[in-house]
């Protein structure tokens, strides 16, 4: 079954206004952004827990809310499942009773059949009579999902479902959650402010900032083509830099930055043609900056683009990778405080190149690794 839903709502609160419009289809739409951006408020409006001041919410051609037409379905008639932050399981009820909670108005035989079916699909068989306090974190997540999915929702809402867990458990349950959501086939909206989590769980990511949507795109498009500098910074991208346009062409852009002229690939989906001398923002992923080996002779211009030299002025050891902070051999203040570029190298490369001993390097950045951010 193919799913489609659209959200266009406005809600004024004393210190905050939410005004968003976005749509999504099959799979998982992740609402991503800083705390207080309006993500959970959007879920509450979708669920019918809060009434927007204006707008329209449609799920699979079924109108849940339409201020102009006077439609506002109560939560129990919306067919929306909700997994709350921290799961909010009822501690005094058994696992079976928690899963059955949304089925109270169904005949007893139907209720028992549905609970057994959901628990079997979620691998909860044999836990019917346990209480939430006797379960592992993974089991609690599945019970919360079971309670939300038992009503056969048209839309599943998940509010930071992994935020209360420690990091190793969060990683394993992220994989499990993705498997469950794709296997169940229910359209879902999930809230998080962890971009790794957003990317792993999403089919589409909707970026929120201060009550507005500033980009909505399939996850791969968002990763490589943020719509603006603001989106790049909210995503936590590193090496977000500013320069000046030298020349813009449909396939590439030349950028003046720190006394160099860099060549970048223009956006393949939206050619951006700013005039010469206009300010321009761009980003370079730290893992795509190459250190040129000194035992290989002079770099070949055919294989190495955007050559520059710099000195390591700081570094951080993250176990499997090293993050190096380099200041270029160029006059003027560095572009990021006391450094110009962050470069990420695997630990093995760090050891082979003896980076701990050798602090001065020539760098190369392929033009396809410099990503322009339209203003």
Kindly give the residue locations of the regions a language model identified.
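Non-catalytic connector elements of ABC transporters
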Residues: 2-41, 45-53, 62-63, 247-375
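C-terminal boundary and immediately downstream tail of ABC-type ATPase nucleotide-binding domains
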Residues: 8, 224-252, 283
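A position-specific signal in ABC ATPase nucleotide-binding domains
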Residues: 50-51, 58, 104
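ABC ATPase NBD Q-loop/coupling interface
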Residues: 56-78
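ABC ATPase nucleotide-binding domains
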Residues: 79, 85, 89-233
């Amino acid at each position: 079954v193919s799913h489609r839903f659209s959200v266009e709502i406005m809600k004024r609160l004393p210190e905050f206004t939410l005004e968003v419009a976005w749509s999504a289809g099959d799979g998982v739409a992740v609402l991503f952004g800083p705390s207080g951006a309006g993500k959970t408020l959007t879920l509450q409006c979708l669920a019918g827990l809060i009434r927007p001041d204006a707008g329209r919410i449609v799920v699979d051609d079924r109108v849940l809310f339409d201020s102009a037409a006077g439609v506002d379905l109560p939560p129990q008639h919306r067919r929306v499942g909700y997994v709350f932050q921290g799961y909010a399981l009822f501690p005094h009820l058994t696992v079976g009773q928690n899963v059955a909670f949304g089925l109270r108005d169904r005949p007893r035989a139907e209720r028992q059949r549905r609970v057994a079916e959901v628990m079997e699909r979620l691998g909860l068989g044999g836990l019917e009579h346990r209480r939430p306090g006797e379960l592992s974190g993974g089991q609690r997540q599945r019970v919360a999902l079971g309670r939300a999915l038992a009503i056969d929702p048209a839309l599943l809402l998940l509010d930071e479902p992994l935020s209360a867990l420690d990091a190793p458990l969060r990683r394993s349950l992220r994989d499990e959650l993705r498997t469950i959501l794709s296997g169940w086939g229910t359209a879902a909206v999930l809230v998080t402010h962890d971009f790794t989590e957003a990317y792993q769980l999403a089919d589409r990511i909707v970026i929120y900032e201060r009550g507005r949507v500033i980009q909505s795109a399939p996850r791969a498009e968002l990763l490589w083509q943020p719509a603006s500098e603001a989106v790049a910074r909210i995503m936590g991208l590193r090496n977000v830099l500013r320069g000046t346009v030298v020349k813009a062409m449909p396939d590439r852009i030349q950028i003046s930055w720190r006394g160099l002229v860099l060549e970048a690939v223009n956006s393949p989906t939206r050619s951006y043609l700013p005039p010469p001398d206009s300010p321009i923002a761009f980003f370079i992923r730290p893992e795509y900056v190459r250190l040129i080996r000194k035992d290989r002779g002079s770099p070949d211009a055919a294989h190495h683009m955007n050559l520059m030299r710099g000195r390591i002025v700081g570094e951080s050891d993250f176990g499997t990778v090293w993050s190096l902070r380099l200041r270029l051999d160029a006059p003027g203040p560095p572009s990021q405080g006391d450094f110009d570029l962050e470069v990420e190298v695997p630990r093995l490369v760090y050891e082979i190149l003896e980076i701990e001993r050798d602090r001065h390097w020539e760098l190369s950045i392929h033009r396809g690794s410099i990503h322009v951010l339209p203003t």
